[in-house]
């Protein structure tokens, strides 16, 4: 699966550390059972039942770690039922994108249980925006299926660890706890044992897994968490995460053993993103000669068909898409990469800063988003996106991350590949 760059999340986490003291941090606790997972456990114990588990998160969830390991645990613990995963993990993405894609990527497949993992990638985000996005995920989920149980899980990085070492949750997880408290959603802090080992000097945050006797001896009794301090090794750090979930399951099972219909009439924040929608870009007006890509036959578009509902390939300067929406927020879900060009953005007749669709990490193509406007006045807005002919010094762009142009022909084009519009509100025909 193609991933958004998870390094962006790491940078956001570092930026967010300075603001920890400005936000009240929740006490760190491995499990808060709250309303439990009653419907999930009842179905898991039913002979012949088909149980679907959704995993919505970032690159830590995308790894073959806690997601794969917990699914294996459920299969072993409840052999009378069958289990299938809905893998909705995209590296480098937070709840701000998750709230727009949860319907398409998870809810459309009818999950019985939804794990939500965004604490790391939301590390530098504003707490109130986290609350609005997480609440939007909850409300959309229960609107689609009131019997779907939800569990928040909080992962950790070296950069986000200082509060945990002092017995507090990081800022992003503390914000998420407000949503969990309000809706009675259980939460599991996956990094409690990680923090315990780190505080005792028995954790190597960033190192390769030892292979030789000399490497093992050099580590002593330290457990190697990750190669980069962020993405746990599947056989070490991810196992600690899985063990935290397994330890927490009994508490979640006894919290509530009655079938439950989840309701969400009252809102924690009236400005939550329950109205967030992922709209195929083909719903927009395309300029003359511009046509949607065939998501089944077009080699490039097909590679993104699991995440993007459509694609329009703007390859000539002057090609454009236009649309109107009624609401308060608009962004674009697209593919950036070596072939990325410059895009002119016009909102309500006013030119915005042009958006460059290649960055320092674009030695390969990946999913991305860019903002058109947010916190807009409730009402109708008009958007125009046009591909520009403006040249880009791509060598200089790549050099910012010590990358280089390998094959000039890969970087020569100046293209734009939008797939969806992210709207809080409604598209206006």
Give residue ranges: language-model regions.
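Charged helix-capping and loop-helix junction motifs
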Residues: 129-136, 169-173
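A short helix->loop->beta-strand "cap" motif at the edges of active sites that frequently abuts
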Residues: 143-151
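The substrate-binding groove and active-site-proximal loops of carbohydrate-active enzymes
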Residues: 91, 119-129, 160-167, 231, ...
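Solvent-exposed loop/turn segments at secondary-structure junctions
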Residues: 59-62, 90-95, 120-125, 148, ...
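Substrate-gating cap/lid alpha-helix
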Residues: 158-193, 197
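Oxyanion-hole/transition-state-stabilizing segment in secreted/luminal serine hydrolases
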Residues: 54, 66-68, 96-131
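N-terminal secretory targeting modules
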Residues: 1-56, 60-61, 67, 75-81, ...
């Amino acid at each position: 699966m193609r991933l958004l760059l998870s390094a962006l999340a790491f940078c956001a986490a570092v930026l967010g550390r300075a603001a920890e003291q400005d936000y009240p941090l929740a006490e760190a606790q491995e499990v808060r059972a709250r309303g439990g997972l009653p419907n999930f456990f009842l179905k898991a114990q039913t002979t012949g039942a088909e149980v679907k588990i959704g995993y919505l998160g970032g690159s830590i969830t995308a790894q073959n770690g806690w997601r794969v390991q917990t699914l294996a645990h459920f299969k072993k613990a409840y052999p009378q039922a069958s289990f299938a995963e809905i893998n909705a993990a995209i590296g480098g993405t937070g709840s701000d994108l998750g709230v727009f894609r949860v319907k398409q990527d998870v809810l459309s497949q009818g999950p019985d249980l939804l794990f939500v993992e965004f604490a790391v990638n939301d590390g530098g985000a504003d707490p109130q925006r986290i609350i609005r996005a997480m609440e939007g995920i909850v409300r959309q989920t229960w609107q689609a299926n009131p019997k779907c149980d939800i569990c928040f899980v909080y992962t950790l990085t070296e950069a986000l660890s200082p509060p945990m070492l002092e017995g507090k949750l990081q800022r992003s997880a503390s914000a998420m706890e407000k949503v969990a408290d309000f809706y009675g959603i259980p939460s599991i802090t996956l990094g409690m044992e990680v923090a315990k080992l780190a505080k005792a000097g028995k954790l190597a945050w960033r190192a390769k897994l030892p292979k030789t006797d000399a490497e093992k001896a050099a580590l002593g009794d330290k457990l190697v968490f990750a190669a980069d301090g962020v993405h746990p090794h599947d056989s070490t750090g991810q196992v600690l995460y899985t063990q935290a979930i397994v330890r927490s399951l009994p508490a979640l099972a006894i919290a509530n053993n009655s079938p439950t219909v989840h309701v969400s009439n009252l809102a924690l924040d009236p400005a939550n993103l329950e109205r967030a929608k992922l709209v195929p870009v083909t719903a927009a007006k395309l300029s003359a000669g511009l046509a949607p890509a065939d998501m089944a036959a077009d080699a490039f578009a097909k590679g993104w068909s699991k995440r993007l509902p459509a694609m329009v390939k703007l390859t000539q300067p002057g090609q454009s898409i236009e649309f109107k929406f009624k609401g308060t927020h608009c962004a674009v879900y697209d593919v950036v990469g070596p072939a990325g060009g410059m895009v002119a953005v016009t909102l309500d007749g006013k030119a915005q800063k042009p958006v460059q669709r290649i960055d320092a990490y674009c030695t390969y193509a990946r999913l991305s988003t860019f903002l058109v406007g947010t916190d807009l006045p409730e009402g109708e807005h008009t958007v125009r996106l046009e591909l520009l002919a403006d040249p880009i010094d791509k060598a200089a762009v790549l050099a910012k991350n010590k990358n280089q142009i390998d094959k000039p022909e890969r970087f020569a084009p100046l293209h734009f590949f939008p797939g969806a519009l992210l709207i809080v509100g409604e598209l206006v025909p």
